[in-house]
């Protein structure tokens, strides 16, 4: 079964996230850059003077076992980088057209 892994992360760690993707041998993804958000650990990122910084999103469609490996890699990166902020959300894919 295919899963959609959505990874939300601080744009400051983009290089580390892309290295993580490479180590997981994941070459196909969709990246959305410069999104705004608020996280419990990393705080608010609205791209302005009061709340500087932005987030990026990666959408990765992958088999379930690879999605679990990617989630583990995200947890490891979060433990390493701390407050910079990264989270993974795993959703089922019903259909690809």
What are the residue ranges of the model-derived segments?
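Positively charged, small/polar-rich N-terminal and surface patches that mediate targeting and assembly
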Residues: 1-97
């Amino acid at each position: 079964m295919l899963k959609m892994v959505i990874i939300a992360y601080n744009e400051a760690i983009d290089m580390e996230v892309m290295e993580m993707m490479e180590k997981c041998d994941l070459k196909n993804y969709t990246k959305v850059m410069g999104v705004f958000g608020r996280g419990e650990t990393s705080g608010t990122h609205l791209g302005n003077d009061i709340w500087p910084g932005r987030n990026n999103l990666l959408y990765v469609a992958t088999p379930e076992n690879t999605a679990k490996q990617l989630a583990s890699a995200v947890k490891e990166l979060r433990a390493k980088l701390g407050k910079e902020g990264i989270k993974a959300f795993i959703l089922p894919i019903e259909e690809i057209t």
